[in-house]
Amino acid sequence: MNFNEILYGVAYYDEYMPYDRIETDFKMIRDAGMNVIRIAESTWSTWEPKEGVFDFTHLHRMLDCATKYELKVIVGTPTYAIPSWLAKKYPDILAVTHNGKELYGHRQNMDITNPDYLHHAQIIIEKLMEQVKDYDCVIGFQLDNETKPYDTCSKYAQAKFVEYLKNEFPDIDEFNREFGLDYWSNRVDDWDAFPDIRGTINMSLDAEYKKFQRKLVTDFFAWQADIVKKYKRDDPVSYTHLRAHETSQDLV
């Protein structure tokens, strides 16, 4: 999609508002010289209040009003703040970190390698895309929000790390030499006996795990992009990520 103007706008959440002023707000946004809003990325629990029950009332209010006031819209996938029902049904979705297991409440508390999380995230992304794909005001999509690896050290992440190491070091003896694991009897001679990474005293191995965690973010973005691309036209796909230089790749 080609733009003949600089995009300048705000994030807007009709679903947060305690009173109805969407018409007033959108007119003020337009009168202030803005031309775009970002929506939808923060309220999975609004779009899916119960498992399999979807309510996109606020979404369509924003899209219809944006059309009326000639505002462009960037739609965000709502995967960085999980609903309470999801955490209750699948407690393993809450990330395990070096500091222990996350509790539900704040955002960005989930394990992006957990298969139950990925399954339900795909469902809400696809449902959201089905709702917005035919609106002319939609000009692009944001994947997740401020994405990080969240220091995930779950059994899923650690299993992926071992597979990553196997691929990087087909010879396990080379792996031990490369990381100096004879020190303090840290040597690993069987991949199936690879210890919990949270206990490592080897800073090189710890750094390799952090590098791997950044790869998890890249893979997560690519996975979401593949879902969104099934629904988008020639709309761009973007993301908000303060460490983008560490994980960026061509997602579009």
Q: How should these model regions be labeled?
A:
Residues T240-T247:
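Conserved small/polar residues in nucleotide/adenosyl-binding loops
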Residues Y8-M17, T43-T57, L103-H120, T147-P149, ...:
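The substrate-binding groove and active-site-proximal loops of carbohydrate-active enzymes
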Residues F26, I39-V96, A225, K229-Y231:
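Aromatic-lined substrate-binding rim segments of carbohydrate-active enzymes
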Residues V10, I29, A66, F141, ...:
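Conserved, mostly hydrophobic/aromatic
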Residues M1-V36:
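N-terminal carbohydrate-binding accessory modules
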Residues G9-Y13, R38-A40, I74-P78, Q142-D144, ...:
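A cross-family glycoside hydrolase active-site/sugar-binding cleft signature
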